[in-house]
Regions:
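Exposed, interaction-prone extracellular/peripheral surfaces
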Residues: 1-36, 52-57, 66, 71, ...
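A positional/architectural concept
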Residues: 40-44
Length: 303
């Protein structure tokens, strides 16, 4: 099984992006096109008109004055601002070369970035990328632009490994700090990464980013992150690059492993909830398009 997707497959995802809710210039109250705008607040909406309510419309946009005057439900409709900058921060560390069901994390991360990138590009937004974790002491940066050829170059980079080795210091923290320094205020930033790790060291940077930007966390998960299979004694590599031997046949050990994962995810969810950051997990055994749609619907209900 390949560790990375074919470039042609990432290019084909532009067709699915049309139904994701980002790539529509229709009024944003319709069931799909309204989803993205209503979840990722702070991108800016321009008032369009008042019209009659249709089934499936977002009732939070009801115009109660017109409804009372006409004795018929009406709501305000909006269009998104003409453009914004979207930055896709994508984890390409060695831990992304992992997957026990469906496919590898690296492939799901690339598919996620492709769907979001195509959708944003179709809205005439500036799309850029920050690929981290695969090159010593640096990250590959793609400046946000509306040029579709630049998006093609980003997707091409995602269709293969980044040359180099994992840096000793925290590559995700470095990427977030680089995004903090180099991204225009008011941008929409997606962090597409393996977040099954210690989060405390990231909390302050995530908080500062969320104050200046619309931030979205997309953890790339595998079932084995939570439920360790019985493989006997096995060697694993942690996020620091250290080899760790685990006796996976021990039921109590697997329970401790599951508890540790749950505590880590609960802490991440708590940070996201406190900072009002959407948290949209994507698993290796799920369809990326469906995962994003489900995650956005859940995030909207929590707003």
């Amino acid at each position: 099984m390949a560790l990375y997707p074919r470039l042609d497959d990432l290019l084909e995802l532009r067709h699915q992006a049309r139904t994701l809710g980002l790539a529509s210039h229709h009024l944003v109250n319709s069931s799909f096109s309204g989803l993205y705008a209503s979840v990722f607040r702070g991108t800016g909406l321009d008032f369009e008109e008042v019209r009659e309510y249709h089934e499936g419309d977002d009732i939070r946009n009801m115009d109660w004055k017109v409804t009372a005057r006409t004795n018929s439900p009406h709501l305000k409709t909006f269009r998104e601002e003409r453009e914004r900058s979207v930055l896709l921060c994508i984890d390409q560390g060695p831990h992304m070369s992992f997957g026990t069901r469906g496919t590898f994390k690296s492939i799901q991360a690339a598919r996620t970035a492709a769907l979001l990138g195509w959708a944003a590009n179709s809205l005439n937004d500036r799309v850029g990328g920050l690929l981290f974790g695969g090159q010593a002491n640096s990250a590959h940066h793609f400046r946000p632009t509306k040029d579709r050829r630049a998006l093609w170059r980003l997707l091409k980079a995602l269709s293969g490994p980044i040359e180099g080795i994992e840096p000793a210091k925290d590559p995700l923290l470095n990427a977030l700090q680089r995004a903090e320094r180099g991204t225009a205020t008011g941008s929409l930033i997606f962090v597409i990464a393996d977040l099954n790790r210690e989060i405390t060291s990231l909390e302050a940077t995530i908080g500062r980013l969320s104050q200046r930007h619309s931030l979205v966390l997309v953890p790339i998960d595998d079932k084995a992150d939570r439920d360790l299979p019985d493989l006997g004694r096995a060697l694993f590599t942690d996020h620091a690059g250290n080899l760790v031997e685990i006796e996976t046949g021990d039921e109590s050990g697997r329970d401790s492993y599951r508890t540790a994962w749950e505590q880590t995810r609960q802490f991440l969810a708590g940070v996201a909830n406190r900072l009002r950051i959407p948290l949209i997990p994507v698993s290796t055994d799920e369809d990326v398009h469906q995962s994003l749609m489900r995650g956005m619907r859940q995030a909207r209900r929590l707003q």
